[in-house]
Amino acid sequence: LLPEHQIIGVSRNNNTQDRNTSWHQWDWLSGRSLELPNEEISTVIVILKPISFDENGYQTGYLKAAEIIIKNLNQSFDYQKLVVMSSTRVYGEKNGRGITETAAPQPDDFRGHIILEYEKIMRDQSKVEPLILRPSGLYDPKQKWMQKFMNSFEAKQHSLSSKESNRFDRNILAKIISNYVAQKKLAELSGIFICSEPPKIFSELFAEQYPDKNFEDFFIASNHLGKSFDFQKLIASNLMG
């Protein structure tokens, strides 16, 4: 993606060198300042994750990291656009079905609350109005759904909490970001965009990928219809091309 652009990757531990990407290792929790070869950056893309899956890990990985990163960006760099990677986890069961960007998030757990607070930090402290992407469960179309579970199956069925899966192709998400960076006509876009596909029943997903196996042998189905999303704003934006 973006062969005509110079990409600077910043990670706490990744120093892989790609064709048009230079990686810089920076542990933002170390107290050191961010140093990069360029002071002017067209687009900043922030993708954070928890350092552990408990509440403290989420607070450190999202809230503390966000404060440090945006402070360093504002102090030392000029940037024109900011992409903030969030999640549909900010919405809860109380948000119901057909959730749009106008719905006030009602998170179910501390994870959703912390991610929502992370969004607010980035929005309030950024020099520019950010583009906030809220994808549902990201998947790689080249990998079979729940392959890891199937490979380690030991005759104990897995109970599903809902009937359907909310998903989004990670390749399409990459295309959205690429289009936003490269296409001038999209530069004025900002605000929240839900990135999700139509919900799909788990048993149908399983049948597509394991047609010779019986879904009920591996999973205990649920009739509960959880939250679902309306992604018409994303379609209308032309971010997907």
Residue ranges of each PLM-predicted region?
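N-terminal Rossmann NAD(P)H-binding glycine-rich loop of SDR-like oxidoreductase domains
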Residues: 1-4
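NAD(P)H-binding glycine-rich loop region in Rossmannoid oxidoreductase-like domains
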Residues: 21-72
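Mid/C-terminal beta-alpha module of Rossmann-like enzyme folds, strongest
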Residues: 171-225
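SDR active-site strand-loop-helix element
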Residues: 10, 47, 82-88, 133-135
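N-terminal Rossmann-fold cofactor-binding loop
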Residues: 9-14, 28
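Catalytic helix-loop patch of NAD(P)-dependent Rossmann-fold dehydrogenases
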Residues: 95-132
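Substrate-positioning beta->alpha
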Residues: 138, 144-148, 157-182
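Conserved Rossmann-fold NAD(P)-dependent oxidoreductase catalytic core, especially the SDR/UDP-sugar
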Residues: 68-108
